Amino acid sequence: LIEFAHESNTFTVKTTGIQDFQNSRYVRGAEMLEQLRGTGSEIGGAIEAAARMGWEVVPILAAHANPGGPVSEIARREITEEACRLLEEGGTLDGVFVALHGAMVTESDQDGESQFLREIRAEVGSEIPVAVTLDLHANVSDELAEHAQIAVSYRTYPHVDMAARAGEACDLLHRAMGREIKPSLLVDRPPMLVGCDDGRTTDDGPMCRILEAAAEEAQAPGLLHVSVNAGFTDSDVFAAGPSVLVCHDNAESAAAQTARRLCDLIWSFRNDWTLPMSLDEAIAKLKGHKLSSKPVVVADFSDNPGGGGYGDCTALLSALLEAGIENAALGALIDAKAAETLIEAGVGGVVTLWVGGKSDPSAGGGPLKLTGEVRAVSNGSLTFEGPMLAGVAADMGPSVCFRVAGVDVLITSNPLQMHDLNQFCSVGIDPMEKSVLVVKSMQHFRAAFEPIASEVLVVDAGGLCSPDVTRRHYERLRRPVFPLDQIDA
């Protein structure tokens, strides 16, 4: 069992180093089993499947970093070399399971997953079946299909089915190891950068209908599994955008026809995509909102650390304060220096300092000079308890609740998308007691926060992850693609 997972935003000024993996998850051998058994993660699902099928498990390593810039060459080499060394020590293997993201970019290769799988293949040989899991937002290259025989992508966004999809991949791997099947992968993609409404599955949108069609197609003789990926637009790589992956058993022609039909279906929904509201619209709605027993949840799509955003943009916080919004909480604003200063002041301390906006003031607002009271401090360690990644430990780093006027600001040291109520609770903020909850997240917040919300507002506050791809300059992306180019239907 191996995990090497990262979603890389190539438009950020930052890179992702080994410390970023250590801040999230970097464990080896038996520690993998101890930390991830029984969790809603891919490795957790694989461990459960292995027990069900009676495998002798050889845990290699689990390396996961929160989304950010391309993975540094130092980090890539360390993780890859460690994985290969442990594989060599693991002895004779019958199969390999690898939890990937699908949108990893390294400093030396725009296709980080294939780069890693090349090394794994060189270590284990060409005959052993390799099964991978992929995020629904994978940018799938043709090369990945050369190194893996089995690929299963998430079918939900928010991603609440990681463990289940890992189990599905392991079922196919078990059949391949027993020589019941000889799987192969085929990948196809429409000429699109944006598609599938970014993969949202919380309503009856394009992705739900495409996934239903994929499930029906997968019933054809010779086909083993069909995955659909919405792609990741914040990565300037050749294969960015939606794709279809078909796993088949000596049925290449049927697989190719299936993939093409699904690509045509994805293309037919090309104009069905949702853009968030402007900051001004959101503030106007908050001002006019009637009091309710449930909070209004405001999601800052554009400053989502889960998409590689900086998480320190201040435009939305500034607008809340200027509008005089009361009984609100905002999380998380990532500023390690501010957190350190506030922790030194201690609970009850009243402090004036510059907060946020330090990564790139041109993207979503520069530093804000704020005066407020330190309400709570924390080392940032917590365990997710909601529908997504339940049971998985997380580390926000030194964190504080800083009350500024009517807003409790969760300030953290490490980047972490808001998708679990416990992130607020860990610093004494009760989400149910607030009138307004602001979360830096695109879609994952919905799993835990939508059930407690009176209304959900999704906002583009000008951060790095703005969904308007026409603002960006793509250099590596294949062309022509929708919506950047005119393409005849």
Label each residue range with its predicted role:
Residues 4-7, 26, 69-80, 88-181, ...:
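Active-site histidine-anchored catalytic micro-motif
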Residues 1-52:
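N-terminal amphipathic/basic leader segments beginning at the initiator methionine
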Residues 11-15, 69-72, 108-110, 141-146, ...:
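Short acidic, glycine/serine/threonine-rich loops at helix termini
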Residues 59, 267, 381-489:
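Extended hydrophobic packing segments that form well-structured cores
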Residues 197-405, 410-411:
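Hard-cation-handling environments
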Residues 54-61, 67, 104, 131, ...:
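Cap/lid and interdomain-hinge subdomains that line or gate substrate/regulatory clefts
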Residues 51-55, 59, 85-96, 283-296:
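Glycine-rich phosphate/diphosphate-binding loops that line cofactor/substrate pockets in enzymes
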Residues 51-55, 85-88, 122-125, 153-156, ...:
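Generic secondary-structure signature for well-ordered alpha-helical cores
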